[in-house]
Amino acid sequence: YILSFIKLYELPFGGSITAASMLPLLAYGYMAGPLWGTIAGFVYFLLQLTQGLYFLTPLQFALDYVVPFIVLGTLSGVFRTKNTAFNLYGGFALAVVARYLCHFVAGFVFWGEYAADYGFNSPVLYSLVYNSFVLVDAIPCFILISIPAIKKLFRRLPKKQKIENAEA
């Protein structure tokens, strides 16, 4: 959450490129699994409310604020059953793309009227481009998990399954 205050670029209608602020939530979702990742995503959403928000309707609020953070925590751990590079990268990629799709739909449906103000003839193209901040924001996350020492750390981290078995 603290990393989300390190904004490298802030967009005019919300959203920003940060210093890998998604990484802790993605990592927790990967380590703890979808259930605990969902809970962490919801808590992360609540924390994000302290940074201010602007919304038009409850559906837009859900698509721009609630669902994107929940899917980051939930989907990052869906492939975590084995310690392979695909499981880590696949879960992270799925989570990031799902977050992007949430923002894209909200941008197209609710913010598309601003497309012409920014030189776009199409609300779809406008939303695709405007919300690409999510993909740019994900690049440092993928770079960091590609560093051999960090990749090795992820492989060694306990998964929730192993923790539950040890308690039994």
Task: Outline where the language-model segments fall.
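Short helix-perturbing small/polar motifs within transmembrane alpha-helices
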Residues: 1-2, 40, 60-108
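Hydrophobic transmembrane alpha-helices
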Residues: 1-31, 36
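Juxtamembrane/transmembrane-helix interface segments of polytopic membrane transporters
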Residues: 4, 103, 107-115, 145-150
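Hydrophobic alpha-helical transmembrane segments
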Residues: 23, 34-42, 58-62, 89-94, ...
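Small-residue faces within membrane-embedded alpha-helices
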Residues: 29, 37, 41, 45, ...
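Structural signal for the C-terminal ends of transmembrane alpha-helices
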Residues: 30-32, 74-82, 147-156
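Alpha-helical transmembrane segments and their cytosolic interface
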Residues: 122-168
